[in-house]
Amino acid sequence: MKDYKHYIGTIITHSGREYPDFALGTYLRTEDEILELLKVYPYDKLMIDTAYRYNNEQAVSSAVIKSGYPQNQIVYIGKINTGQQESGNTVREEFEGTLHRLRIPKINIYMIHSSRSSKYCKTWIEMIKLQNEGLIDSIGVSNFGIAAIEKIYNQSGVYPEINQIVFPQNASERDMYDVQKIIEYCQDKGISVQAAMPFGGSKRSNELSELQRLVILKQLRSQDLTCVFGTKNIQHLCQNISWIEFGR
């Protein structure tokens, strides 16, 4: 078995759950691309970000199995698209579909992918039931603003443990002000924040110098944010992670 000699830090949520302080994003990634990363992935823990909408849950599962990376060292993030229920499927059916495609008996983190559908409050209440059954460790949301979080809390009495926020491409000062307000609100409520595409997407990331990327990551780590990296370049991934760990 491969000896994973590199150790990474953790973030603790308000429920006391402990998760790696970065995640591997799989948006637009194929099975082969994920497999190539996992073959040389040198760290002792792996948090892997998936979603029904990415249409690659089965590809992620196959890549993990083929890579030989220990399943007991993996934290899975899954996301339900509230629009899926327009087809008549229940939250439970969609959740069980994710477990089946990922080939796992339960999931570590399960999120609502966005608040665009009017059904997100109903979805949230059903997710609480699944968590109470022991099928989900932590429930969260993705790209929820303050008003949407308040709405699900008012209807359920339960705040998300995690809010994953995609950082806007070509972000204006106003965009980043809005993101910062959400981060501050979440942290005030004890909600952990994940920064997806922390450099604003691949196009913007390629335009940034190493120093600029380092400054961004240090700012995010100073706020205890988890970063979700979607790169398919293992050198870039390891460099970003090393900067995060150095800044701890």
Go through each PLM region and give its residues.
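Beta/alpha (TIM)-barrel catalytic core signal, keyed to glycine-rich beta->alpha loops juxtaposed to Asp/Glu
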Residues: 3-7, 31, 114-248
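Active-site mouth loops of central-metabolism enzymes
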Residues: 21-32, 79-89, 118
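CE4/NodB-like, metal-dependent polysaccharide N-deacetylase domain
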Residues: 91-111, 129-133, 155
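Short, acidic/polar
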Residues: 29-41, 86-103, 122, 146-151, ...
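Short amphipathic alpha-helices and their capping/turn segments at secondary-structure boundaries
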Residues: 10, 61-67, 94-101, 180-185
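A short, structured active-site edge motif that brings together acidic residues
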Residues: 72-84, 108-113
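Short, well-ordered coil/turn segments that N-cap beta-strands
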Residues: 17-22, 44-47, 69-74, 104-108, ...
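N-terminal binding-site loop/beta-alpha segment at the start of enzyme catalytic domains
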Residues: 1-74, 105, 126, 200-203
